[in-house]
């Protein structure tokens, strides 16, 4: 499943996990993307939307 928000374009990003001894290991931070039914131009469509966009009300959910 693609981890990209179709509204804001948020996608996974990389970085390092840093241990107490300062060793660095690569890791991924993934956005919390949900598959939701959304009303777009009067039609119901399934989209992948991050929870930040859902909370902000950037999409109108279909009931």
UniProtKB/Swiss-Prot annotation:
One of its GO terms (cellular component) is ribosome. One of its GO terms (biological process) is translation. It comes from the Bacteria. InterPro entries: Bacterial_rp_bL28, Ribosomal_bL28, Ribosomal_bL28/bL31-like_sf, Ribosomal_bL28_bact-type, Ribosomal_bL28_sf. Coiled coil: none annotated. GO terms for molecular function: structural constituent of ribosome. Keywords: Ribonucleoprotein, Ribosomal protein. Disulfide bonds: none annotated. Belongs to the bacterial ribosomal protein bL28 family. This is Large ribosomal subunit protein bL28. It comes from Kosmotoga olearia (strain ATCC BAA-1733 / DSM 21960 / TBF 19.5.1).
């Amino acid at each position: 499943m693609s981890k990209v928000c179709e509204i804001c374009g948020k996608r996974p990003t990389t970085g390092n996990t840093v241990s107490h001894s300062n060793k660095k290991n690569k890791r991924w931070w993934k956005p919390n993307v949900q598959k939701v039914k959304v009303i777009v131009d009067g039609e119901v469509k399934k989209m992948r939307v991050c929870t930040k966009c859902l909370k902000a009300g950037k999409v109108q959910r279909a009931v």
